[in-house]
Curated annotation (Swiss-Prot):
The gene is menC. It comes from the Bacteria. It catalyses: (1R,6R)-6-hydroxy-2-succinyl-cyclohexa-2,4-diene-1-carboxylate = 2-succinylbenzoate + H2O. One of its GO terms (biological process) is menaquinone biosynthetic process. Its EC number is 4.2.1.113. Pathway: Quinol/quinone metabolism; 1,4-dihydroxy-2-naphthoate biosynthesis; 1,4-dihydroxy-2-naphthoate from chorismate: step 4/7; Quinol/quinone metabolism; menaquinone biosynthesis. Pfam families: MenC_N (PF21508), MR_MLE_C (PF13378). Gene3D superfamilies: Enolase-like C-terminal domain, Enolase-like, N-terminal domain. The keyword Iron-sulfur does not apply. This is o-succinylbenzoate synthase.
Length: 320
């Protein structure tokens, strides 16, 4: 016997979270809980403002429609990426397809003072990998900060993300301030320039490896082995169903590319599922999931070792 519940939620964010020139004051989303007999599965649907093609309201409408169809015996999935991902996660938990084992390591995310990152990394066991957002300030400053971090921590590897912020000139200004001897320890720089061709040229000219992120969601993108391209960053909330995520990971691995499962600032429930997906599909690759510190609360399932308060299901608004 099938049954389902849908919850709506809103989590206050820390004051300094800015996405594409918009301050993100709250993170809004939905949960779906599917039951079939004794089994239960959860999924999170939380479109990311400025990045997702669908709004939270559109996702809610699509989710409620899909849940009603599922209750009637339908086996299909919704079209909207965030809804398809959340629904497929709930189904994968329900059927036991999604393994319980998780990779709760996370590449620390540096969003402010680089000194804070140095302190965090000093206590980090094993390989030291961190992520730094670039392109928010002057390119020269970004280059100096990256150089400082690589100089201060000789065994550090950095993942950088520019979100297509730079012109070719700005990208070159950044590279000029990174010691050529350190550039091999830049694991990759996500989408440095506004166009793929400019990003490819940047990789060739500087020797700094790049990764595709936004490009994966463009209609003309194809997976290819290219000079200077080292990785793809897969954000399941923006990608679609678990099957689509698996297809992208497999396509990347077939070409020798690193595939990194990455957060779209999901709640703790969604992040713990992404940690399980990473352990399942990209074992041995550190996922990019260090975004919980941007929020003021956890929900339903806490992240292991995190001290933020965790809300229970009866504290959320139920829609169904």
């Amino acid at each position: 016997m099938r049954s389902a519940q849908v919850y709506r939620w809103q989590i206050p964010m820390d004051a300094g979270v800015v996405l594409r020139d918009r301050r993100l004051k709250t993170r809004d989303g939905l949960y779906v809980c599917l039951r079939d007999g004794e089994r239960e599965g959860w999924g999170e649907i939380s479109p990311l403002p400025g990045f997702s093609q669908e709004t939270w309201e559109e996702a809610q409408t699509a989710l409620l429609t899909w849940v009603n169809d599922w209750l009637q015996g339908s086996e299909g999935l919704p079209e909207m990426p965030s809804v398809a991902f959340g629904a497929s996660c709930a189904l994968a938990e329900l059927t036991g397809v999604l393994p319980e084992a998780a990779d709760y390591r996370a590449a620390p995310l540096c969003t402010g003072d680089p000194d804070d990152l140095v302190l965090r990394l000093a206590d980090m066991p094993g390989e030291k990998i961190a992520k730094v957002k670039v392109g928010l300030y002057e390119a020269v400053r970004d280059g100096m900060v990256v150089n400082l971090l690589l100089e201060a921590i000789p065994d550090l590897h950095l993942r950088l993300d520019a979100n297509r912020a730079w012109t070719p000139l700005k990208a070159q200004q950044f590279a000029k301030y990174v010691n050529p001897d350190y550039r091999a320890r830049i694991a990759f720089l996500e989408e440095p320039c506004k166009t793929r061709d400019d990003s490819r040229a940047f990789a060739r000219e500087t020797g700094i490896a790049i990764a595709w992120d936004e490009s994966l969601r463009e209609a003309d993108f194809t997976f290819e082995a290219e000079e200077g391209v080292r990785a793809v960053v897969i954000k399941p909330t923006l990608t679609g169903s678990l099957d689509k995520v698996r297809e992208q990971v497999a396509a990347a691995h077939a070409l020798g590319l690193t595939a990194v499962i990455s957060s779209s600032i999901e709640s703790s429930l969604g992040l713990t599922q992404l940690a399980r997906i990473a352990a399942w599909l990209t074992p041995g690759t550190l996922p990019g999931l260090d975004t919980l510190h941007l929020m003021q609360a956890q929900q339903i399932r806490p992240w292991p070792g995190n001290a933020l308060p965790c809300l229970k299901r009866d504290e959320l608004e139920r829609l169904l």
